[in-house]
A protein has these predicted regions:
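Short amphipathic helix-loop junctions that connect adjacent transmembrane helices
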Residues: 98-113
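Intracellular juxtamembrane helix-capping segments at the cytosolic ends
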Residues: 183-196
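C-terminal membrane-cytosol helix-exit motif in multi-pass small-molecule transporters
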Residues: 38-57, 246-254
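Structural signature of the two symmetry-related core transmembrane helices
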Residues: 144-158
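Juxtamembrane intracellular "pre-TM" segments in multi-pass secondary transporters
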Residues: 52-83
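Loop-to-transmembrane helix entry/capping segments in MFS-fold secondary transporters
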Residues: 1-5, 198-208
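Helix-to-loop junctions at the C-terminal end of transmembrane segments
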Residues: 128-141
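Helix-loop-helix hairpin linking two adjacent transmembrane segments in secondary transporters
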Residues: 5-48
Length: 331
């Protein structure tokens, strides 16, 4: 699910790159803002009238951010690699597009015709990255494929910096850039959800999304600053060096384990019993991670606080019946 969401984020950028020049050419810069406003209203109507009504029964930690956990999660060694990664990825994207459209114009492609190059290059890069996603998931090679995509991103940025200005050199570099970008954009949310500690997925996703948009914000500032001091071509070099830092960080990622998350309402009422059950759970075969949160009220209307157990398990090994029996023992 998370990989699919990531893919559609990448596709939305693809369509934005195609439609942007067309709308701007037809209606001017103000037309872009009117078009964005129209799409926003359309999205609101879709949510209101097309998304099925549902009542969420998800425990609090998996659906919303928990402020008391944010500081700890920011320092999490594995999650921080992804947070810095998405920051650098979107910083590079924003910074590069300060100068990339100008370079296409200089190579002979009129601004209003940029969609003619963005459409095939972005769609081509999308189809190029799909086989690598399939191989990574089927062969359980997510970590080397991930590092390879970051390396490809670095290569594309170095090529944009090194190669002499020309239409086909730009096309080659942009295809490589967006192959890496689309792969990373699609896979990082999935990796993040698998690395997230049990019971704090809402906080983890919040930090990740904030890093993503802060990266886009920083890209505009850093790109403009570098261009004013050293020229626009230097933007590619600075972003390539930043991506090399990310590549070094990616080598420290842990190998991803196949796991599934469960949450259970328990009959545990005291902190002492929660500690005892946590120890028993973590020693059971197939339990990768166990978190018991004592202060979440049940939704049954009784108002009595029961602990919620958040478990990350290996489905091939774990005995869920034994787990449920332990969690529902009367004390």
């Amino acid at each position: 699910v998370m990989a699919t969401i990531g893919m559609f984020i990448g596709l939305s950028f693809t369509f934005a790159m195609i439609l942007g020049p067309i709308v701007a050419d037809a209606f001017g810069l103000s037309g872009l803002f009117w078009f964005t406003g129209f799409l926003t209203i359309l999205a609101m109507l879709m949510i209101q009238f097309m998304v099925p009504y549902s009542v969420s029964k998800a425990p609090r930690g998996d659906s919303v951010a928990l402020p008391e956990q944010i500081s700890k999660l920011i320092r999490h060694p594995q999650l921080s690699r992804l947070n810095w990664g998405v920051f650098i990825l979107h910083m590079a994207l924003t910074a590069c597009f300060i100068t990339l459209p100008k370079q296409f114009v200089a190579s002979g492609l009129a601004l209003e015709n940029h969609w003619q190059i963005y459409l095939p290059t972005l769609l081509g890069s999308f189809f190029l990255m799909v086989p690598f996603m399939i191989i990574a998931m089927k062969k359980q090679q997510e970590k080397p494929m991930f590092s390879g995509a970051v390396a490809l991103l670095s290569l594309a940025l170095f090529l944009l910096w090194l190669l002499p200005l020309g239409f086909w050199s730009l096309v080659l570099s942009v295809v490589l850039f967006f192959t890496a970008f689309n792969y990373l954009e699609a896979t990082m949310p999935s990796i993040l959800s698998r690395l997230a500690p049990a019971g704090v997925k809402g906080s983890v996703m919040g930090i990740y999304s904030s890093s993503q948009f802060l990266g886009a914000f920083a890209g505009g500032i850093v790109g403009g600053f570098v261009a004013s001091l050293y020229g626009e071509q230097s933007i590619f070099l600075v972003m390539a060096l930043m991506s090399l830092i990310w590549l070094a960080l990616s080598f420290g990622m842990q190998k991803l384990k196949k796991s599934k998350s469960f949450s259970f309402i328990t009959n545990i009422h005291t902190d002492e019993r929660a500690e005892e059950v946590s120890e028993l759970l973590i020693n059971m075969p197939g339990i990768i991670e166990a978190t018991l949160v004592q202060d979440e009220p049940r939704t049954s209307g009784k108002g009595k606080a029961h602990a919620v157990a958040y478990l990350k398990v290996d489905e091939k090994i774990v005995d869920l019946l034994a787990v449920k029996a332990l969690l529902h023992q009367e004390t």
